Amino acid sequence: MNWHVAKRMGVVLAVALLAACKDDGGDGGGPDGGTTTASAGPGTGTSKAQPEGTPFTLPAGITLETPLKSFYVEDPRDCDDKDRDDAKGSGGAVTLCLIFRNTTGGPITVTLPPGLIIVSKDGSIQNGLLAQRVSIEVPPGERYFTPLFLYCANQDRATSGVGDEYALGPIIGYEGFQELYTLLEGKQLTRQAVTPIQLAITHLTNGEGLSDSDRAALKAL
């Protein structure tokens, strides 16, 4: 693999994602010069609270090494040399390496649902949101590595850096989110799709809801 080309592509994507995540339609200031709260619910937008939703559990026989950690996608030696071509999910504001163990004698499929939020252990780093359902077949035996790409859920926080720690959160279904999941269901997404999706998610997580242009862009993917 040409890591120089991959790195340049990764930088371009990261810049586009950051711009989309930061597109909050204003400067974040209140009328007195202070900050305003822009959030669809706990753990999204500017909220520092723990996300609320349906608990997520792994299938019997599957364990996941914790804490979950982000990794450097362009040099993925910390994720068993699996890169963006091996990744599940889309996005890129939060890039995690999941390490599973299957303690049974046969393969197990792990399904991660849309709306699953991965919670940063550092309040200055973004939580990550899964926008589409993904399935991961985990073979029996030793550690099985899977990169997972997620969208920015907090427009006022930094993107994930190497070694940032995360934990599995609940499946969130705040107002308007189910419409997003439905619009994206079953779509085969390209890297070019990431920016309009992130922009729509930023509108949702800030409590603004999807705009007509968001809906049109998502339907066109």
Place the predicted regions along the sequence by residue.
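Bacterial signal peptide processing site
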Residues: 22-24
